[in-house]
């Protein structure tokens, strides 16, 4: 089994594909065939790719899953399909961003574009600026020869302010400010 990520409608319900499927946490789900965009249990190796099918809207759920059995990949991002899947744990927003950063660090040859999906503003590399609204997240993922770091913070209106531009350094400094 390998670690993957999957988006769900509320209550661990998958509605994309062949109708509606109800998953149960920590239980093995099995099917006969896996073919991306057709059949099987779909998941992504990069949690960020899950946002292509399910929005982070406060209702949908994003889980870490164990995937195995027969696995099919089609080269569309990190999407895969498998015949065995276990929903392991629902992810918080911070965990979701950290798991995405981990995927980025494990795939240094892959190119990632700065993006904004749902409440997440993500920039890759140094000397970038991000801003957002109250309740959204700012995330800098930096990987170079010296270090691999992820700085992710919610815009809380207290330490991290809405509408203000932050660099990775200023975001970290604002978060670490006493007060």
Predicted segments — roles?
Residues 1-179:
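Short, glycine-biased loop/turn motifs at secondary-structure junctions and
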């Amino acid at each position: 089994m390998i670690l993957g990520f999957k988006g769900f409608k509320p209550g661990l319900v998958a509605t994309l594909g062949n109708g509606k499927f109800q998953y149960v946490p920590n239980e093995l789900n099995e099917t006969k065939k896996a073919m991306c965009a057709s059949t099987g249990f779909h998941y992504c190796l990069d949690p960020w790719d899950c946002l292509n099918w399910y929005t982070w809207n406060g209702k949908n759920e994003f889980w870490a899953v164990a995937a195995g059995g027969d696995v099919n990949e089609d080269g569309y991002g990190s999407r895969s399909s498998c015949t065995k899947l276990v929903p392991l744990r629902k992810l918080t927003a911070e965990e979701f961003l950290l798991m995405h950063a981990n995927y980025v660090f494990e795939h240094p040859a892959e190119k990632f574009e700065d993006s904004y999906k749902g409440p997440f503003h993500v920039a890759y590399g140094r000397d970038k600026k991000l801003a957002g609204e109250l309740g959204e997240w700012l995330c800098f993922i930096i990987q170079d020869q010296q270090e691999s770091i992820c700085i992710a913070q919610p815009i809380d209106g207290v330490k991290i302010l809405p509408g203000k531009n932050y660099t990775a350094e200023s975001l970290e400094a604002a978060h670490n400010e006493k007060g």
